Swiss-Prot record:
NCBIfam families: orni_carb_tr, PRK00779.1. It comes from Aspergillus terreus (strain NIH 2624 / FGSC A1156). This is Ornithine carbamoyltransferase, mitochondrial. Its main location: mitochondrion. PANTHER family: ORNITHINE CARBAMOYLTRANSFERASE, MITOCHONDRIAL (PTHR45753), ORNITHINE TRANSCARBAMYLASE, MITOCHONDRIAL (PTHR45753:SF3). Pathway: Amino-acid biosynthesis; L-arginine biosynthesis; L-arginine from L-ornithine and carbamoyl phosphate: step 1/3. It catalyses: carbamoyl phosphate + L-ornithine = L-citrulline + phosphate + H(+). Belongs to the aspartate/ornithine carbamoyltransferase superfamily. OTCase family.
């Protein structure tokens, strides 16, 4: 099994004698011109998250029909979006570059061979210099502290394109997919209209799950998570998820179990992700053994009592041990619309945080 780049990947190892290692200063003050950043769905109110999802869906239908909304036309003209990626990427890179171009901007890709946060110069220096030359930074990094420090010292908006703790762009795309699938076309309420829906996550507790759980709490969607023992959601993350539901009239409930059948009971959507992420190569055999019985199959859905018209989602790349071909390529699968929606989610995020300077109404 080839480990994927989504969760907790380690930075490329560099000989100590070859470079000087720096860490970002904790004594330096935050920029007085601090813009608004998107580091996690926890940074958004329920209304803001709803707006980002709805805008993503609306822009999708407008642009695909050949009508680019007036407020988007050339909205990033003359602006450069720096894409600082220390992890390899397919969907995130393509969607971010495509979104920037759609808005008339110039995407500048800086891979791990071009720039490494905290290597050769401090992260503070990198943040200050890069943000002085571009209009936004989209960062795909290892530790959450890296993107948090980058945002702390940047004078332009920073959008988290993945770290070991969160993946907000994926969450926007996921809920756009759910919204387009489950919300009636005649829906005119202020919410996404997903209250009472149930998602079952079967697999590893990772960054994609964490932002999905925060989103679910804000949207009134119940989320049942089944992981093997020892792979549960960390206590600190559970607290953040619970916090996300505060102030919501009917917040989504978070349920944890070690039994997949319990999670999928009465579920409308079954979701999984990679079992072995980059940085976990040495754990591969251990993880494969631990996750036996956690493959999503039609039989699992039937045994657990998933709702009759249940759907399946996966953020990709997918490996066959995570979900059967029968489910992955069936009419229950939303994986390819979900992948496409990464583009529209990126457009919505750039509009909200760069074009509109964080004013999301």
């Amino acid at each position: 099994m080839i480990p994927t780049a989504r969760c907790g990947a380690l930075r490329q190892k560099i000989p100590v004698q070859a470079v000087r290692q720096y860490s970002s200063s904790t004594t330096l003050k935050t920029s007085p011109f601090a813009p608004r950043h998107l580091l996690s769905i926890a940074d958004l109110t329920p209304t803001e998250f709803t707006t980002l999802v709805r805008n993503a869906s609306s822009h999708k239908h407008s642009i695909k029909s050949g009508s680019i909304p007036t407020n988007l036309q050339g909205s990033l003209a003359g602006k450069t979006v720096a894409m600082m990626f220390s992890k390899r990427s397919t969907r995130t890179r393509i969607s971010t570059e495509g979104a920037t171009v759609q808005l008339g901007g110039h995407p500048m890709f800086l891979g791990k061979d071009d720039i490494q946060l905290g290597v050769n110069e401090s992260l503070y220096d990198t943040a200050v210099v890069v943000s002085s030359m571009v209009s936004a930074i989209v960062a795909r990094v290892g530790k959450h502290a890296e993107v948090a420090d980058l945002a702390k010292h940047s004078t332009v908006p920073v959008i988290n394109a993945l770290c070991d703790s969160f993946h907000p762009l994926q969450a926007i795309a996921d809920f756009q997919t759910i919204y387009e699938t489950f919300t009636p076309k005649a829906h005119h309420l202020s919410s996404l209209g997903l209250e009472g829906l149930k998602i079952a996550w079967v697999g590893d507790a990772n960054n994609v799950l964490f932002d999905m759980a925060i989103s679910a709490a804000k949207m009134g969607v119940d989320l049942a998570v089944a992981t093997p023992k020892g792979y549960e959601i960390p206590a600190s993350m559970r607290e953040l998820i619970q916090e996300a539901g505060k102030g919501v009239a009917n917040p989504g409930k978070l349920i944890q179990t070690n039994v997949p059948e319990e999670a999928v009971k009465k579920a409308d959507i079954l979701v999984t992700d990679t079992w072995v992420s980059m940085g976990q190569e040495e754990e591969s055999l251990k993880r494969m053994k631990a996750f036996e019985g956690f493959q999503i199959t039609s039989e699992l859905a039937k045994r657990g009592g998933a709702n009759e018209n249940w759907k399946f989602m996966h953020c990709l790349p997918r490996h066959p041990e995570e979900v059967s071909d029968e489910v992955f390529y069936s009419n229950r699968s939303l994986v390819f619309p979900e992948a496409e929606n990464r583009l529209w989610a990126a457009i919505s995020a750039l509009e909200g945080f760069v074009v509109n300077k964080g004013k999301i109404a």
